[in-house]
């Protein structure tokens, strides 16, 4: 009976018509035998049920055929069924305008790819995908393993292990996973590019307090938990007051004086110092949480995000301003080309960078950095010994310099002596570009390196959104969030290349960075000083904070030094005597 039923079904022709595009699509169907069956006769629930079995790629393609299928394929009911199929254990669809569609696409596009620099295989491999993960938000490779944080705060521990493939034992990266902890907000480790130094993992999480007899109410508190990266064992925990909520954590400094920088929801920076060499000892001690100087001396600033290295920290405000902390003279000279404003006794004093537009995100290497503004322009600064700035030469830059031939990057990464940029080459493809030192295979296809950004021989996934490189491997994170739109704006015609920048006076009425409020704060700080000597020193600090060009800062510092020396010598500096 089954063999006869198949030909009978094939004789009936289904009429694929669109209600909004007309009832007739052609004359060919009229010539067919039998009465055609229109898709309009199917109930909407049946149509949604049928197309919910399609792969996500085919469902998106079907929704682009006509208006009717676009409305059907865009329904939340279809995406709810797909999301249940992709992530059966997902209980909550999350938040947003389109929660089920967002959740389904997050879980469909999630993936972590890696390519080893050494060896014969020069292709991307995919790590194990945790079934419990709700998309991938960020990741961090350590010495032995990889840690991934999803969109519901679950931190996964992807282990390297020996596996048997075709009867042969092979060492594979990120092939097994376990859940490290839940309720995580952010995590960090040693900021150096070499993963050998990443012994501990610091996790910023929210925990419900333990029930105490005699209390009726309990509030969730933020805490920092420290884990061994090798085994995932928790060795230390510090809990904060429930009134303080944080959203980001970064590390800076050496192991014996490791500084933890914590960013609050209000945009303030707090710091505390721990000794990593004593974390594995079974004892408890108290650490002091203090307000960082960037938030103490500049209270009007609201920090949006921060990034760090072993001896420097970069802050980006909500208005797009950038402030720098440099803690060693060598790195300061590489970044700014001078030691004029470096104070070894006050290393936390922030310095403002002079930038033409609002900065969206940045990347910080050991002695160079990259900035991306709201128009998609890339600015590089710092040491350029290996051509890691991508300017086409090997001359150091003491102030942000635009890389004119590269715009609108997806993400930017700066390493020890090379830089990587993930760019959208076309609508359906992405490419990875790099510059700097190519030793050890860190620039695939360019073993001798390059002083300009060149296309690397890496097959980039379609939904790649983040990248990271270690000494042994290149990692690419794949994820797509439909609620994250393109952040870039079109550059005004008056500010295209070849047109002079508008003067400070022309932009003063807009005051995008709150400069007027900042100047009032500076004046109040100078007024609070008691002596002329203290006021001169405070003015030097303020010059370092203000977004001035390097030559302008040197001029003001030299002029203030002249006035200070004249004051110390007992003689005043006045106008020259008139000629007779």
UniProtKB/Swiss-Prot annotation:
Protein name: F-box only protein 24
Keyword set includes Manganese: no
Function description: Substrate-recognition component of the SCF (SKP1-CUL1-F-box protein)-type E3 ubiquitin ligase complex.
GO biological process, one term: mitochondrion organization
RCC repeats: 376-425
Organism phylogeny: Eukaryota, Metazoa, Chordata, Craniata, Vertebrata
Annotated keywords: Ubl conjugation pathway
Gene Ontology MF, one: ubiquitin-protein transferase activity
PANTHER family the record matches: F-BOX ONLY PROTEIN 24
Gene designation per UniProt: FBXO24
Gene Ontology CC terms, in alphabetical order: SCF ubiquitin ligase complex; ubiquitin ligase complex
Subunit annotation: Directly interacts with SKP1 and CUL1.
Species annotation: Homo sapiens (Human)
Cytoplasm among keywords: no
Annotated F-box domain residues: 36-82
């Amino acid at each position: 009976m089954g063999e006869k039923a198949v030909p009978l079904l094939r004789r009936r022709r289904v009429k694929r018509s669109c209600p909004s595009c007309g009832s007739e699509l052609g004359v060919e169907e009229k010539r067919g035998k039998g009465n055609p069956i229109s898709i309009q006769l199917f109930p909407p629930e049946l149509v949604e049920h049928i197309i919910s079995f399609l792969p996500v790629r085919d469902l998106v393609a079907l929704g682009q055929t006509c208006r009717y299928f676009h409305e059907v394929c865009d329904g939340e009911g279809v995406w709810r069924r797909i999301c249940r199929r992709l992530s059966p254990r997902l209980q909550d669809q999350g938040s947003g305008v389109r929660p089920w569609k967002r959740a389904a696409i997050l879980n469909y596009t999630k993936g972590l790819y890696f390519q080893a620099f050494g060896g014969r295989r020069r292709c991307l491999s995919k790590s194990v995908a945790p079934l419990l993960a709700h998309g991938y938000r960020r990741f961090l490779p350590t010495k032995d393993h990889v840690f991934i944080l999803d969109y519901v705060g679950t931190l996964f521990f992807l282990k390297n292990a020996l596996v048997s493939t075709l009867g042969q034992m092979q060492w594979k990266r990120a092939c097994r996973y376990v859940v490290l902890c839940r309720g995580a907000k952010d995590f960090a480790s040693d900021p150096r590019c070499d993963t050998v130094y990443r012994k501990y993992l610091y996790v910023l999480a929210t925990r419900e307090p333990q029930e105490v007899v005699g209390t009726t109410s309990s509030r969730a508190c933020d805490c920092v938990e420290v884990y061994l990266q090798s085994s995932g064992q928790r060795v230390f925990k510090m809990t904060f007051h429930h009134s303080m909520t944080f959203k980001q954590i970064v590390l800076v400094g050496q192991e014996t004086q490791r500084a933890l920088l914590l960013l609050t929801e209000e945009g303030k920076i707090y710091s505390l110092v721990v000794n990593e060499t004593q974390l594995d000892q079974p004892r408890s001690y108290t650490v002091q949480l203090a307000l960082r100087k960037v938030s103490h001396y500049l209270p009007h600033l609201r920090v949006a995000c921060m990034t760090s290295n072993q001896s420097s920290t970069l802050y980006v405000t909500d208005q797009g301003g950038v402030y720098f902390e440099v803690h060693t003279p060598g790195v300061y000279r590489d970044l700014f080309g001078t030691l004029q404003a470096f104070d070894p006794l006050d290393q936390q004093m922030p310095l403002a960078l002079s930038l033409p537009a609002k900065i969206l995100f940045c990347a910080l290497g050991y002695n160079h950095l990259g900035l991306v503004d709201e128009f998609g322009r890339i600015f590089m600064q710092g040491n350029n010994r290996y051509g890691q700035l991508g300017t086409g030469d090997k001359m150091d830059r003491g102030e942000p310099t635009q890389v004119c031939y590269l715009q609108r990057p997806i993400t930017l990464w700066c390493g020890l002596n090379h830089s990587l940029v993930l760019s959208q080459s076309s609508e359906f493809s992405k490419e990875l570009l790099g510059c700097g030192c190519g030793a050890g295979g860190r620039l695939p296809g360019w073993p001798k390196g390059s002083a300009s950004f060149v296309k690397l021989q890496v097959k980039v996934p379609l939904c790649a959104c983040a990248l990271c490189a270690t000494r042994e491997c290149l990692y690419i994170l794949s994820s797509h969030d439909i609620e994250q739109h393109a952040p870039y704006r079109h550059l005004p015609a008056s500010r295209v290349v070849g047109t002079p920048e508008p003067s400070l006076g022309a932009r003063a009425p807009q005051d995008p960075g709150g400069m007027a409020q900042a100047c009032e704060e500076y004046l109040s700080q100078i007024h609070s000083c008691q002596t002329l000597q203290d006021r001169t020193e405070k003015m030097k600090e303020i010059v370092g904070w203000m977004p001035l060009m390097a030559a302008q800062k040197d001029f003001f510092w030299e002029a203030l030094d002249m006035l200070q020396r004249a004051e110390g010598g007992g003689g005043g500096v006045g106008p020259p005597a008139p000629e007779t």
